[in-house]
Amino acid sequence: DKLPREGGFLLVCNHLSNIDPVCLLWVMMKADIPVRIMAKSELFKVPLLGGAMRQMKLLPVNRRAKDPGAILASAAQALREGECVAIYPEGTLTLDPDLWPMRIKTGAARLALDTGAAVIPFIHWGEQKIMRSGSALIDFRPRRRVSVRIGDPIPLEDLCRESGSADHEAVEEATKRIQRVMIEEVAALRGEEAPTGVWDRKLKERVDY
């Protein structure tokens, strides 16, 4: 069991399908560890859905805020209070043609450096066979298997300083480490060799880490 039983920690998850959070919630429920999943704040304004998200104690992410600290404030507070927080650092469903994690944003690194929370990879594979990326249709055919791999904490202690996420070089290095480990863990779960480079959603091609 690689999930801590005490203290706040951050799960970094790859994003294949809109039902990924269901898989995450199921695994964490079986582990008897409550999890706060980060979700874009716009969804909280949707009738019925917003109420359900608040009931589930999801954490709103205000992506329009100009201050990066304000965007992640609720998640940082939850981590400081000893809670488990889950983030999809790609920011959206992967656009990689082969469903590898695409270039991640800096949010996970910022949270880790600002709170000192452990960062643990939560990798899954198979949800895309139940609900394809960008689709709202569920495939109810049997034998749709979802596999989960929980990795070791990503070493970031040497980057944690009093300046936290204000240290831009530390944020960049932490982001690269998280990116690299996520891809390595996906490769291990899929039993495949990872591609060279990472998919950049803007350039629509693979680039160096």
Indicate where each model-derived feature is located.
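Catalytic core of membrane glycerolipid acyltransferases/transacylases, capturing the structured
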Residues: 5-65
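A charged, well-structured terminal subsegment
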Residues: 73-81, 146-172, 178
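Hydrophobic/aromatic ligand-binding patch that stacks against planar heteroaromatic rings
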Residues: 27, 52, 77, 110-114
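Short, highly charged C-terminal tails/helix-capping segments
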Residues: 189-209
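Residue-level preference for the first positions of well-ordered beta-strands
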Residues: 8-10, 84-88, 120
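A cross-family acyltransferase "interaction/gating" segment
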Residues: 3, 98-165
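Catalytic-site beta-strand/loop segments enriched in glycine and acidic/polar residues
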Residues: 78-108
